[in-house]
A protein has these predicted regions:
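Carbohydrate transferase catalytic cores enriched for Leloir-type hexosyltransferases
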Residues: 1-383
Length: 383
């Protein structure tokens, strides 16, 4: 039997700070739900790691699974981990599953796990800082390159969320002259699991953009489209609902949101949105808008289609991998195309939208059972 170890450092830190789970965090929580009953928790900082006892692991997993923000309990877990850790223990068939990028740049992390007979398997979500550094904060490309290269050199296995991510990883490994470790592609399931119908949050046609406000998501472009819609159609223009926190390098978007008078009544910003409210926004949207320049996976795409909601998206390879020909695709800089499609989709009678609704019926929703089926079979191959 394989002994599973889960690094929960990022999850506990964010829970202690009262932060809502990100997409990466939700993956980590899914791994706890899958393996938590028999796994051990790991805490790490700058490559120094401790393995928690079974009792401390259960407590950590319970706090995370139930989103219990008990900072005192979290501090006790960390303190006990330093005293009661199994740092020098040797495990039979141990495998560390690390679902975030945090800490994968430290080679001593891999060495310490190897010293415990624990193989290291990391999930790679994207290589965007390397392939498109212009969309990231300064310096992120160097940090991410160190993470990826260290994993290529030392990891026993890698999990990617899409074939597109694996292809990018393979090209980067080839460019660096590094071998690609054993790997598996395992698609991620939508975070929204309930399909219960809820009442519409807005009595008007609207569209949703979902994701952190950052340059590669193309919010600035879409706000200009909306300004044109308002100029053309006035009060009858559809609404735009932006669900996501303000991120980095987005001052031009913030200027539009806060200072463009014509957008005041047409754009709604939801920076802290619960799963229930997000489901309501998506269920009744005319479409999800996904005009990104680049994505590693694109979870909102899968979430919208799983709810039966049409999608207007950039024509990205990873989107076609996840959704095939179901969405209506556009170039992320085709202003006239986006304007026309949004105006058409806003109408009560829209043949293009009706046709997509028919295509959605054949969408194959990724599930966690499928994901972990791929992962479990992969782990059995690691010797």
């Amino acid at each position: 039997m394989i002994n599973i170890f889960l690094d929960v450092s990022r999850l506990l830190s964010r829970l202690s700070d009262g932060l809502l789970p990100t997409g990466v965090d939700r993956v980590g929580l899914a791994y706890i739900q899958r393996y938590g009953t028999h796994a051990r928790a790991v805490l790490s900082e700058r490559g120094i790691s401790v393995v928690l006892t079974e009792r401390n692991s259960r407590q950590a997993f319970e706090l995370l699974s139930q989103s219990i923000r008990d900072r005192g309990a979290i501090r006790k877990i960390v303190a006990r981990a330093c005293v009661d850790s199994l740092s020098n223990h040797y495990f039979e068939r141990g495998v560390l599953l690390h679902t975030s990028h945090n800490g994968m740049e430290h080679s001593r992390y891999y060495r310490s796990m190897k010293g415990r007979n624990i193989r290291t398997v990391f999930m790679v979500h994207d290589l965007i800082p390397l392939t498109h550094p212009e969309y990231c904060r300064p310096g992120v490309d160097g940090a991410h390159r160190q993470r990826i290269y260290t994993a290529l050199r030392h990891a026993d296995g890698l999990i990617t969320n899409s074939q597109a991510t694996l292809d990018s990883l393979g090209m980067e490994a080839n460019r660096a002259g590094l071998p690609l470790p054993p790997n598996v592609v395992a698609r991620l399931a939508p975070a929204i699991t309930s399909r219960t119908s809820v009442s519409a949050p807005l009595d008007a046609p609207y569209f949703v953009m979902l994701g952190t406000i950052e340059p590669r998501k193309n919010h600035w472009f879409m706000l200009h489209i909306w300004r044109r819609l308002v100029e053309r159609f006035g009060a009858s223009a559809p609404k735009l609902v932006i669900v996501g926190r303000r991120g980095w390098e987005c001052e031009n978007v913030v200027d539009m949101l806060e200072r463009c008078a014509s957008l005041g009544d047409a754009v709604i910003e939801e920076s802290d949105c619960s799963d229930e409210r997000l489901r309501a926004w998506l269920q009744h949207a005319r479409a999800l808008l996904f005009p990104s320049f680049v994505e590693g996976y694109g979870m909102p795409l899968a979430e919208a289609l799983a709810l039966g909601v049409p999608v207007l998206a950039s024509d990205l390879g990873v989107f076609r991998e996840v959704a095939g020909d179901i969405p209506d695709y556009l170039d992320p800089l085709d202003g006239l195309g986006w304007f026309d499609q949004i105006h058409a989709y806003a109408q009560e009678q829209c043949p293009a939208r009706d046709e997509q609704l028919r295509r959605i019926k054949r969408f194959s929703e990724p599930t966690w059972d499928e994901h972990f089926g791929h992962v479990d079979r992969f782990l059995e191959t690691l010797r």
